[in-house]
């Protein structure tokens, strides 16, 4: 189902830019398909994919910041150092999972 936000942010600007709305619909989301510059596409699915990638990128950036912060503040105490390293290891595991979800290595 198409939201009002998607109509405002995606479909309306496409129509104004000269894209042609086709009489076919996306099998995934039900949005009308569009054609522009010889390319047929679903603007809603592309918009949603872009939003998802931006969200994942934001999470990755925050995790990298935290990893850097931990790496720059390693304690001298062995017990505390072990805690830091375990947390850093978990962050790296999560980052790797995010990369696999996005299909990159």
UniProtKB/Swiss-Prot annotation:
It comes from the Archaea. InterPro entries: SSSCA1, UPF0148, UPF0148_domain, Zn_ribbon_RPB9. GO terms for biological process: DNA-templated transcription. SMART domains: RPOL9 (SM00661). Belongs to the UPF0148 family. This is UPF0148 protein PH0795.
């Amino acid at each position: 189902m198409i939201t009002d936000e998607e109509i405002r942010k995606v479909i309306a600007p496409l129509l104004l830019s000269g894209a042609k709305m086709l009489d076919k619909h996306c099998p995934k989301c039900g949005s009308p398909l569009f054609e522009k510059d010889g390319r047929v596409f679903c603007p809603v699915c592309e918009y949603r994919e872009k939003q998802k990638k931006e969200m994942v990128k934001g999470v990755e950036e925050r995790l990298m910041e935290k990893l850097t912060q931990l790496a720059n503040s390693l304690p001298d105490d062995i017990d505390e150092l072990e805690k830091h390293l375990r947390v850093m290891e978990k962050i790296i595991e999560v980052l790797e999972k995010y990369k696999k979800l996005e299909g990159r290595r």
